[in-house]
Amino acid sequence: EAYRTFKSGTVHVNYQDPYLSRAAYRYASEDVLKDVPDYILHRLKETTNRKAAFINVATSFPDLMQGVDQKRATMARKAMTPKTRPYQDKILRTLKWSVVPYPSFEWSKKVYPEYDAGDGLMQFFEDLIRIMRLDEENPLDAFTKHLNYLEKIRRTLNDFHFKTLIYKGGGTDLTVDLPDAHRWVSGAQKRGKDVFLPNIPTEELFTVPEKNGVNGTLVVTKPMSVRGTIINPFTLTFK
């Protein structure tokens, strides 16, 4: 079905290669890293003005940026972010968008270290297919049922009117005060009459804390991949 949309000319593909980004961070001059080509901004302006829907098919290369000077990578991001932020904000706040995962060999090695690379990749695909209900007779109905379940839990959380959330375990000892008017939100969002999922798959139920109401220690016990660099378990302290 996705390929058939090309018949109406409604699909535009923007491909980004992280290996090219790595090469640029390593070898490009600082002037090149700081340069934001006009065509990038023109594309964002055109697509947002047309109220396009955005699908980001994202994968992860967990160790790709190891050995890269992060100051140079940060330099490039700092040049890009201010110029693209108005369009990114418009996408996030007014348009329909979704991020979906696509496994890579590198990613599967981290998730399934007990498998050979090829077998790990296939296992990754099989698990994603199951989690996204694509193995069901009617995947859309199955995922809609899941969203209805999340919506039921969301309403229950709102009915509790929690004052404070307390997290303990694994070294974590954290209290999170919630605003009186806080509301819980599930993974589905609306734009007019349309419903979309910012993240697929989704198990999300979330709210916001009181501005100065977070205190204690949060221990992240699983490695995280951030912009191509693995961050091992670490601790955050809030006061």
Q: How would you label these PLM feature ranges?
A:
Residues 210-239:
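Long, well-ordered mid-to-C-terminal structural blocks that present hydrophobic/aromatic surfaces
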Residues 1-214:
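Active-site bordering "gate/hinge" segments
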